[in-house]
C-alpha cells in the first residue's frame, strides 16, 4: 500500500480473517466487488476487538465523541425510511457488545455467498440486528454522515451543499463508480471540489 499517512499503523488483516476467506459478489451491480467480504471482516474485527471501524470513502469533517457503547450512522433509503448503515460503526469492547457481531457472523456463514447481492450483509443485515438487539437509540440521524444517499450520488458534483450539522460525508464509492462520476473532474462549487481544497 502506497502513500500511507504518517501516524497510521499498517497491520496484517490475516489476523482477523485469513486471505483464503476473501470472497466477492458474483451478481448484481457490484459484481466482483469486495464490500460483502469487507462487511464480514468488520463484524469479525468488532467481535474480536471492539473499537471504531470506518470505510475509506467516508470523510470526517468535524471531531465527534465516542462516548456511548455503540455508534451507528444511518441513511435514508429510496422510500425515505431511516436505516442503520455500516460505513462507520463504533462498538465498545466487552462481552455485552459481542452478541450483535456474533449474530452478524453467524448470518453470513449460513448464506450462499454466490447468491448474495450488494447491501444484503451490509446495511440490510446491520439494520435488522440493530432492531433485534434494541440498539436504535445509538443510531445517528442521516444528516450527520449520509446527507447524500447512495442513490443520489450526483449531488456530490452538482452544487448541492452539506448541512451545517454534518460531521462527515459518505462518498458512496461503489455507486459513484456506477454513475460514472469522475472524482478527478468536477465543478468548483461541488462537494468533491470543496473537500479537495480542504484536505489535499
Where are the regions a protein language model picked out?
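Glycosyltransferase-associated regions of secretory-pathway enzymes
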Residues: 1-39, 54-200
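Small-residue hinge/turn detector
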Residues: 39-51
Amino acid at each position: 500500500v502506497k502513500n500511507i499517512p504518517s501516524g497510521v499503523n499498517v497491520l496484517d488483516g490475516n489476523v482477523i480473517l485469513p486471505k483464503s476467506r476473501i470472497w466477492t459478489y458474483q451478481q448484481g451491480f457490484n459484481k466482483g466487488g469486495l464490500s460483502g467480504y469487507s462487511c464480514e471482516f468488520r463484524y469479525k474485527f468488532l467481535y474480536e476487538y471492539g473499537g471504531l471501524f470506518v470505510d475509506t470513502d467516508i470523510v470526517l469533517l468535524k471531531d465527534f465523541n465516542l462516548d456511548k457503547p455503540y455508534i451507528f450512522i444511518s441513511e435514508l433509503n429510496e422510500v425515505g425510511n431511516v436505516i442503520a448503515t455500516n460505513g462507520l460503526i463504533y462498538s465498545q469492547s466487552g462481552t455485552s457488545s459481542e452478541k450483535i457481531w456474533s449474530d452478524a457472523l453467524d448470518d453470513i456463514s449460513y448464506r450462499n455467498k454466490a447468491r448474495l447481492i450488494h447491501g444484503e450483509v451490509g446495511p440490510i443485515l446491520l439494520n435488522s440486528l440493530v432492531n433485534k438487539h434494541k440498539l436504535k437509540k445509538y443510531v445517528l440521524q442521516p444528516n450527520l454522515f449520509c446527507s447524500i444517499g447512495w442513490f443520489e450520488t450526483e449531488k456530490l458534483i452538482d452544487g448541492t451543499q452539506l448541512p451545517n450539522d454534518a460531521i462527515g460525508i459518505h462518498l458512496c464509492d461503489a455507486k459513484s463508480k456506477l454513475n460514472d462520476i469522475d472524482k478527478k473532474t468536477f465543478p468548483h462549487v461541488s462537494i468533491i471540489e470543496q473537500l479537495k481544497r480542504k484536505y489535499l
